[in-house]
Amino acid sequence: DWSSDVCSSDLELLTWWMTEENFHQVIDHFLVMRICLEPQACLLAATVGTAEQKAHLNTLMAEMAALKENFRRERWIEVDMAWHEHIYEMSANPFLTSFASLFHSVYHTYFTSITSDTVIKLDLHQAIVDAIIQSDGDAAFKACQALLRSPDK
């Protein structure tokens, strides 16, 4: 079992441990953790996020939408990661923010693996932004669950 070999003090090592053989297992574990934490981060972003933070989230979402018309794969991955990390920052919870930082490279590996030649789940990302901007924590929580539970491709 690869998980017993991972040093808990340096979770960034996960990307080093990730091999072609265990990639899907690592990602499955990562997605379980995301489904536990990310909807709560969205709820908090909606309820405690500042107007300035919400405006920045809207700017990131606008860039994601623009990439639908003029897709650039590397830029999509950067903006999608920034979008998710910004929501964690908006939660104002240092543990949630630390999660996003700790797993930055795992997020990058995951987003790189699922991104091909088009934007991904734009409408589901927009539903989260709409709920956060409207300060509707419950809707943000549910919209995030919908995003994380829908198929990647």
Model-derived regions, located:
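A short, structured loop/turn motif at beta-sheet edges
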Residues: T50-L57, M90, I133-D136
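Short, small-residue-biased leader/transition segments that mark boundaries at the very start
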Residues: D1-S8
